[in-house]
């Protein structure tokens, strides 16, 4: 089993998750892809009830980040493109995550972030470690961050990926209203922690 990642600065995600005590609450990743971020979190945090991976797969067309523009496409699809997030990728990831699933450490919510946030099964949980690596538009990440902030445990950490593709300062500022502060930034990742 070789679970790979396609991003940068995974060493920061590992550092921020290392020995972080979830105190019996959930951890979550929006945008699982091949599962490397989720694996790093599960291998490093302590005392999480379960890790939830959220990803719809299925080659959906959507705008991935604020500054995407695809010339020549109809207005409806401008800024959108189908990524290689196929159902086959999902099936491979689930096989690779078999040990974690078998031990009750991982479950996949095979749906969009919007569906996840509206789903009653996930709406009333408390989350202690969150990794936002799905849609990278400011408005989407802001919506996710506020949703998780409203369901956060004391000292929850929210890690945001691909910060160079969105207005991260806006998101960090809004999270101050939920008592989150930035504890460290890399070139493409930021970690915020609830006071």
Q: What is each residue range found by the language model?
A:
Residues 3-195:
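S-adenosylmethionine/decaboxylated-SAM
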């Amino acid at each position: 089993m070789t679970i790979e990642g396609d991003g940068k600065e995974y060493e920061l995600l590992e550092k921020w998750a290392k020995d972080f005590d979830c105190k019996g609450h959930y951890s979550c990743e929006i945008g699982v892809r091949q599962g490397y971020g989720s694996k790093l979190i599960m291998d490093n945090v302590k005392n999480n009830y379960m890790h939830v991976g959220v990803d719809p797969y299925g080659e959906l067309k959507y705008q991935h980040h604020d500054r995407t523009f695809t010339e020549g496409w109809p207005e409806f699809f401008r800024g959108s493109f189908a990524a290689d997030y196929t159902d086959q990728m999902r099936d491979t990831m689930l096989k690779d995550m078999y040990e974690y699933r078998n031990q009750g450490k991982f479950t996949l919510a095979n749906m969009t972030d919007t569906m996840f946030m509206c789903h009653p099964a996930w709406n009333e949980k408390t989350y202690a470690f969150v990794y936002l690596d799905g849609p990278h538009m400011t408005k989407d990440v802001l919506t996710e961050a506020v949703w998780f902030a409203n369901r956060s445990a004391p000292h929850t950490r929210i890690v945001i990926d691909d910060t160079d593709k969105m207005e991260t300062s806006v998101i960090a500022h809004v999270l101050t209203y939920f008592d989150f502060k930035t504890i460290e930034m890399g070139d493409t990742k930021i970690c915020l922690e609830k006071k």
